[in-house]
Regions:
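N-terminal transmembrane-helix/juxtamembrane module of multi-pass inner/ER membrane proteins
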Residues: 2-103, 141, 168
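Membrane-embedded catalytic cores of phosphoryl/pyrophosphoryl-handling enzymes
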Residues: 4-12, 159-274, 286
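Hydrophobic faces of alpha-helical transmembrane segments in multi-pass integral membrane proteins
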Residues: 16-19, 125, 129, 133, ...
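Alpha-helical membrane-inserting segments
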Residues: 23, 27, 77-81, 85, ...
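Juxtamembrane loop-transmembrane helix junctions in multi-pass integral membrane proteins
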Residues: 50-64, 115, 172, 198-205
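Interfacial segments of alpha-helical transmembrane regions
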Residues: 92-140, 203, 207
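Short, Lys/Arg-enriched, Gly/Pro-containing loop segments at transmembrane-helix junctions
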Residues: 93-99, 147-149, 252-264
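Membrane-interface interhelical connector segments
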Residues: 142-170
Length: 287
């Protein structure tokens, strides 16, 4: 029973994104669908992508949109740092300090941060690892953005990532594959794994919301000529895998595969006793 459950977890969480990767590679990288779609958005007379010249569109979809993942990362980082403060405060030795913290409601914030230290640290690590993976791939494939290439009025050649990939060194100056802005939206998938730890009933809605956010982020850049559509799909695949591989050592497979809570059940942050015997998948002991 445990073996079949484990196999299903890995098949679903690794198998589906890997199947999507194969599909994207065959449908987009092996064809000219990306170029055909971008051609529809390009004005061949003016030699521009019209939406690239709309200042408000750029500000709304590229600059302001970053607030969501940026603030999430900043809140997680602040929470992770605060989580180490409460254990250092000895209210029995310093009752006046303890009283002040209680009156100012700071104590409840510090206790909350301490109780959710693992979650805050996970989000920080997941965001950092996702960013690192995307930056590595950008540097080691050196793909230029459509708007920079000769296909759309630029001066640089159009190249496919698999023709340019270098494992141990940077491949050039191109930094377009996979989609960086899309990956910013997809990194919100980290919150889905936090929700899975607590078996939140709406965790799937959170997952779909993060996927939609990343897709919207990526699509807006496609409309401006700064990415091909496949760049968004690749970003989602890599970010999912990075978040999943980060969540496994933080929370453990046994916890992540548990069914969501029903209305009458109370959430708990710890795995059930009968699942704790699965040592390879047991989460770390810190809170």
């Amino acid at each position: 029973m445990l073996t079949s459950s484990r196999n299903r977890f890995y098949w679903v969480n690794f198998g589906i994104p890997l199947a999507c990767a194969a599909l994207v590679f065959l449908l987009f990288d092996m064809t000219r669908i990306d170029i055909a779609f971008s051609n529809l958005l390009f004005d061949p007379v003016a030699r521009i992508f019209p939406l690239d010249k709309v200042h408000f569109f750029e500000k709304l979809t590229h600059k302001w949109a970053r607030i969501i993942p940026n603030w999430t990362a900043e809140i997680a980082l602040i929470g992770a740092m605060l989580s180490f403060v409460w254990p250092l405060i000895n209210t029995s030795k310093h009752p006046r300090l303890g009283g002040f913290l209680e009156r100012s409601k700071a104590a409840s914030v510090l206790r909350f941060a301490n109780e959710h230290r693992r979650d805050f640290l996970f989000v920080v690590f997941a965001f950092a690892i996702c960013t690192g993976v995307i930056h590595f791939l950008k540097a080691h494939t050196s793909v230029y953005c459509p708007i920079e290439t000769t296909l759309y009025g630029g001066k640089l050649p159009h190249v496919e990532w698999y023709n340019n990939f270098q494992l141990f060194r940077e491949a050039g100056d191109g930094r377009c594959w996979p989609g960086g802005h899309a990956s910013g939206g997809f990194t919100m998938l980290a919150l889905y794994f936090v929700a899975r730890r607590y078996r939140w009933r709406y965790s799937k809605a959170l997952m779909y919301g993060a996927l939609l956010l990343g897709f919207v982020y990526g699509t807006t850049r496609v409309l401006q000529g700064w990415h091909y559509m496949s760049h968004t799909f690749w970003a989602g695949i890599f970010v999912w895998l990075a978040c999943l591989l980060t969540a496994l050592p933080f929370y453990g497979r046994a916890r992540l595969e548990m069914p969501v809570l029903q209305k009458a059940e109370a959430p708990t942050a710890e795995p059930l006793t009968d699942l704790q015997s699965s040592k390879p998948d047991a989460p770390p002991s810190w809170s």
